[in-house]
Amino acid sequence: GEQDAAVLYTTAQSSNVCIAFLQRDAENRWKVCQSIEGLADTVDNVRLAQLQDGGSMQMVVGYLASQGDSYLAVYSYENGQVSAILEQSYEQYLVEDITGGGNQDLILMSTLEDGGVQIELLTVDRDGSFQQVAVMGLSADKFSGCASVAAGLGADGKRYLVLDGWTGISGNNLATVLLRFDEESQQMIPADQISTSELYSASLRNVPNLVSRDLDGDGTVEIPTQPDEAGLLNMSQSRRMDFIVWMDYTSPTPEKSFGLLDEETNCYIELPAEWEGNLLLTDSTEIDAAVELRTVDENELVLTLRLVSASASAAGWTRLGVVASRQMQAKLGEGAVITDQTYRLSRSLYRLN
């Protein structure tokens, strides 16, 4: 029931960061119980996690070496004794109850020598023992590294892991892998709802920072896609925008959100789903630095978007929010038809930072 403390510090005698673990003595003074040397000269992140039974917490420390390599260490601290239960290089990691066992699990991503991605799971097995399992690898012919990892609940109530990997000739494109924890094999396996190859093709996208995320805060991680049929683009090259469809492939109706991505401000503007497939995005000829959405079949103006100074008046416009220190405003066209009663233009802006 007593709180302990951990202090990260450097000394002239060590090139790496050190960690001291402290407890209060009988006179309520802090006393160093044990000190250990870390794995590099810089600490990138620190967090506590409950990875084991018994109520004790583990400390997860991400280190960044001067040459740019990242290392992860997991320290177990009980009764004044510290032990390192994991020390290895990594690219991305996630602490989440992905197995559904009640404790948090550690999912670790690292790049193999051949360029593929290895996924490791640190969890408590059925016998209560702490184990590290190499759950699967992503082949080097498809992926060259890990961009991001997220976890969430699927539409079926199961826990899923969503991995975005670098791919393409340049290595700057993204594609997604969807995994779930299998109770019988105690391993992460590909999701049943869509094949790995189908998901790779569907999720292939050319925006490096467009990663999977829980877009609407419902606990499910949505996967962004750039389908050609979502809409047409006819605008200047100075403004990078594209139509995006966010998908939940664990659901029998996978499409969650349709809208417009503004790469310049890294924001997403949700649009009525009924507009998908019948939109043309073009520069406005009437309003400076604005863009218009028009119907493909009738060239009807349905929405105008513009970026103005944060203090500009929004009279006659709907203020969506402030992005990149500027105000995003929108105005529906006179011929715009929205049958979806749940859609609200004023709540359509999502910041993707």
Residues covered by each model-derived region:
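A broad, low-specificity signal marking well-ordered, structured residues that form hydrophobic/aromatic
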Residues: I269, V291, M328
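Alpha-helix initiation/capping motif
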Residues: T11, T253, T295, L307-S309, ...
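Secretory pathway targeting signatures of secreted, lumenal, and periplasmic proteins
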Residues: E274-L320
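Beta-propeller-forming repeat regions
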Residues: G1-S284, L349-L352
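Secondary-structure transition/turn motif
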Residues: Y90, W166, D228, R294-N299, ...
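Extracytosolic low-complexity repeat regions of secreted or lipid-anchored proteins
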Residues: G231, A312-T339
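Surface-exposed amphipathic alpha-helical segments
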Residues: L279, A330-N353
